[in-house]
C-alpha cells in the first residue's frame, strides 16, 4: 500500500499483504500494488540489496529494487466493482475478519465460506470447456471476462493483483446469495455439479 509506506517512520512490508485474498488496504481504501508504477518490475522487497555494489546509500523498502522509484508516491487507486458495492463490501469484510483472526483478535470469519470462495475461484480459473463459470459471472455483473493464456493450470496466488481482485469480486457476488446464484449457474450449465463438490472434504450444509 503506497499510503502505508508513506506514513511509516521506517517503511516496512506487512505480512498480510502476501495473502492472496488481500488485494486492498482497508485503512486507506486503496488497491495494493504488485508492480512498480514506473518500470513494471515486480515489487520484491527482498531484492532491495541486489546490485548495490559499493553504493553508500542505505536502501529503503519504499523504493523499487529495479529503478528506485518511490513506491510511496505511486497513485492510490480505489477498489473497483462492477455490479454493486455489496460484492466489494462482502469481500472487504472477509479480509477484515481474516486479519483479525491472524492477530488473535475476535473475528467473525466463517472458514466454510472461505472454503467455498476458494473453490469457486478455482473453478473460474479452470480452462475446461465444460466450465463456463468465469464467463457466466462476468456477464452477470457486467465485467469483461478474464482470458487465461495457454492450458497450464494457474493458482490464484500466482496471478497479478488486478486478476485476483476481479476473480474475488466475482466469487463474492456468488457468495452474497450462494444457494440462489450457484444453483442458477448450475442450471445455466456454467458449471457441473460434480466439479462443484469434488474438492470438498466436508460440504457446507447450505
PLM regions and their residue ranges:
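Basic, alpha-helical nucleic-acid-binding regions used in initiation and control of genome expression
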Residues: 1-206
